[in-house]
From Swiss-Prot:
Pfam families: DUF520 (PF04461). GO terms for cellular component: cytosol. It comes from the Bacteria. Gene3D superfamilies: 3.30.70.860, YajQ-like, domain 2 (3.30.70.990). NCBIfam families: PRK05412.1. One of its GO terms (molecular function) is nucleotide binding. Belongs to the YajQ family. SUPFAM superfamilies: YajQ-like (SSF89963). This is Nucleotide-binding protein Mvan_0997.
Length: 163
């Protein structure tokens, strides 16, 4: 019997983030407490989002609205990293980035967790910004998925190419 395997990745569906951003922008334009504050939310490059408002409280509230929209679209909060509000002239800005890929140190933590706490006979290999987990038994792979879902890691994980 051939080995079964799956890949552990950390990727965010950009279209879902774009939908959440558009929903947040629409809500910010119609909400009463944001009237007259010139609050905007927009893409800044490929992986960055910028939120601008007239006061620090409004920019923090706009970040909360955006995070709420991300959660409703099943995007993990671990995938979005928002900075602190910064004053620039008469406005306040928050720049946030989307985290894509598993860093080498996080990959090492995950493979160590699989080796230490996972079932015997499961192999985890780091392949760039993803991890390939393989085993002879599919039940062992399902146990590893449950282990990783239950672990408190700093990165949002998805499981793809399950074969």
């Amino acid at each position: 019997m051939a080995d079964s395997s799956f890949d552990v990745v950390s990727k965010v569906d950009r279209q879902e983030v774009d939908n959440a951003l558009n929903q947040a922008a629409k809500e910010l334009s119609t909400r009463f407490d944001f009237r007259g504050t010139d609050t905007t939310i927009a893409w800044k490059g490929e992986e960055a989002i910028e939120i601008v408002s007239s006061t620090e409280e409004r920019v923090k509230a706009a970040v909360d609205v955006f995070k709420e929209k991300l959660v409703r679209r099943d995007i993990s909060m671990k995938a979005f990293d928002a900075g602190d509000p910064q004053a620039s002239g008469k406005t306040y800005k928050v720049s946030g980035t989307l985290k894509q890929g598993i860093s080498s140190e996080d990959a090492k933590k995950i493979t160590k967790l699989i080796r230490d706490e996972g079932p015997k006979g499961v192999k985890a290999q780091i392949q760039g910004d993803e991890i390939r987990v393989s085993s002879k038994k599919r039940d062992d792979l399902q146990a590893v998925i449950a282990l990783l879902k239950g672990a408190d890691l700093d990165v949002a994980l998805q499981f793809v190419n399950y074969r």
